[in-house]
Amino acid sequence: MNKTIAATKAFVEAVDPEVTDKADWGIATPYLALQTAKAGAKNLIVAAENVHFKDSGAYTGEVSVEMLKEIGVEWVILGHSERRQYFGETDETVNAKMLQVLKNDMTPIVCVGETLEQYEAGTTKDVVKTQVVAAYKDVCPKCAARSVIAYEPVW
């Protein structure tokens, strides 16, 4: 819940002109600021922070792929550590979202990473591998090539 609409607008106005074509640069904003970010971003990729794995239905407070696409958002973060920690998202949930996003020709940004306890136990590689394998279950190689993996340790 960082960045209000006004703060998002100011950020995009300050950063967007500085973006070069040497890399893909983006901002993921809360839902309410997505349209503001899209309106101001000429060079920045604008991503949603989350999406639901169903096309539609009675999922109060959730946002569908169709809703995001309607406002021009084509990138979405999946499996962020905060979603896993505070909302109980699982590898299976991330996979369901991944399949939904890819089916709708959007670009998923799949977050993976270990906790401090897992790091200290020396299981980082196993944890991250498990998360990646689960996220990409039933994803064709061509579709996987349209995705991004973001490594972010949870500590």
For each of these PLM feature ranges, what is it?
Residues G26-A28, A47, I77, I109, ...:
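Structural detector of well-ordered beta-strand residues that form the stable sheet scaffold
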Residues P30-L32, V51, S81, G113-T115, ...:
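Histidine- and/or cysteine-centered catalytic micro-motif in compact active-site loops
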Residues Y31-V46, N95-P108, V133-A135:
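Alpha-helix-loop-beta-strand connector modules within alpha/beta enzyme cores
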Residues D105-W155:
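Active-site rim beta-loop-alpha module in soluble metabolic enzymes
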